[in-house]
């Protein structure tokens, strides 16, 4: 009879098989009411799951991440139930949990309207209030196909037909609605109390544009109302900070149909870019990197030898000239190996660090493009370190220090570190992967940091350390990477002369602190809501006159500040000063300098700092304030 070990180490013995719910009830009535699912020997299961052996069990409630996952998945089914109640002719397809919520795809004769969405959400609330039991049962594959065909659910039947013969499938029934699902689900609809439908979008069946267009209803679900309110507030703030809107409002960049996934940078936007790039260039120079430049296009044969053609071809732009195939580079690494290979290298040259603000192009699907965050043409702050195995840990430590200093400079103080391990599609021997992954773990230990491991998410040629920064809205963005690669030096025949005069392969470390500069600038725009710190702002201040009488004095002030190295705009338009102040406030400039007759007579400037009136200052005092505000180089 089963002995059940709980997370605190205590063991409960039962004289017959017992469900997860019954174990929870034996601990306390409160826990039984709160139980949403269980984790039996690491596997997430329903509360109705019968345990007939000795096992480890954790009861899952809405306080656990697993609990929230179960709530969201179950709410997707509640959505489908409500749609079938209101629109019986609609056919259901798939409805998974996603980040912060869920979606469900439906086939219906007409698009769902905002009024439909409100009615569906109301029906979901009614069904939840009824606290209808959610029951799991199993059917053989062929019976499941016959069942779904009998109720007119052709899409579900098609899904099951792709499952091998002889499989037994799990179905979930709540009231009049039954769905195919692995589960687990909440024990009853009454556990689903906090949800909201967000929007409807189109989605092709099975993600194939040749198939029919379905309607995807997105929703969000939470354990507590205050969590939902906080999420909706975050979305509202995110909309205000949307880099696509601010990019136009602040005259930084624009996008247009003639160049999908490519960015047109305006003067202010390009100044912002240069502020970031020049800071990174100085940082890399200080760290001993040698800046290089590699061709935009190289013979397809090189990409075949590197492994990119076999593992990345669908993302590459291919062209032809004089009967030779060329690929526009999606990455900089093979080019850096060519520079390494251009001369005889000695162990005394290592570590050799190359850096490139390399322009890359990737053939991203048009549906995946998003402002400047997801583009087809982008620049990476790329770098490659050629070193010996003995040098890996020190190089990793040095890069870790560098990347943390960079994030601190840009105002990101919350950084999570993750280790992405071998993907399903990869090159190289398993023993090489074992060595590379353990090498990355050793490097992280040497840095003295904690990390999370992500199985299956490494690059096709090696594992990678990922740096995830958290922005002002609490959103996480993966930016920096450090990848350990034994494969590419082998495939492209890179070697150096060792201290015993033998030829050896270098280890290659791929590294980037920011990743795509376009994406990082998008993150910066949204993080600061366009109100950049002084050092980063494309225009740091504007000098405005009140009347024509102060125009010459205003121009002198602007010229003197420019001479001291500041980025200054001069606004001498014949407009009311209130109008000029409001207009420049929308541009989110760090400082506005106003000069009238009094300032001109006294040799002063009136200063506003993003709405805060700093009063009248001498130009020397104001310049000293500016210099004190600028970070050290």
Curated annotation (Swiss-Prot):
Cofactor dependence is on: Zn(2+)
Q: List the disulfide bonds.
A: none
User: Pfam families in the record, alphabetically?
Assistant: HGTP_anticodon, TGS, tRNA-synt_2b, tRNA_SAD
Q: Which SMART domains match?
A: tRNA_SAD
Give the protein family. Answer: Belongs to the class-II aminoacyl-tRNA synthetase family.
Keyword ATP-binding assigned to the entry: answer is yes
Q: Which reaction does it catalyse?
A: tRNA(Thr) + L-threonine + ATP = L-threonyl-tRNA(Thr) + AMP + diphosphate + H(+)
Instruction: State which gene encodes it.
Output: thrS
EC number(s) stated in the UniProt entry for this protein: 6.1.1.3
Classification from the root reads: Bacteria, Pseudomonadati, Pseudomonadota, Betaproteobacteria, Neisseriales
Q: What is known about what this protein does?
A: Catalyzes the attachment of threonine to tRNA(Thr) in a two-step reaction: L-threonine is first activated by ATP to form Thr-AMP and then transferred to the acceptor end of tRNA(Thr). Also edits incorrectly charged L-seryl-tRNA(Thr).
Q: Which GO biological-process labels does this protein carry?
A: threonyl-tRNA aminoacylation
Q: Which compartments does it reside in?
A: Cytoplasm
Protein's UniProt name: Threonine--tRNA ligase
Q: Where is it found, in Gene Ontology cellular component terms? A: cytosol
Query: Residue ranges of region Catalytic?
Result: 242-533
What is the species of this protein?
Chromobacterium violaceum (strain ATCC 12472 / DSM 30191 / JCM 1249 / CCUG 213 / NBRC 12614 / NCIMB 9131 / NCTC 9757 / MK)
For this UniProt record, the keywords arranged alphabetically read as follows:
Aminoacyl-tRNA synthetase, ATP-binding, Cytoplasm, Ligase, Metal-binding, Nucleotide-binding, Protein biosynthesis, RNA-binding, tRNA-binding, Zinc
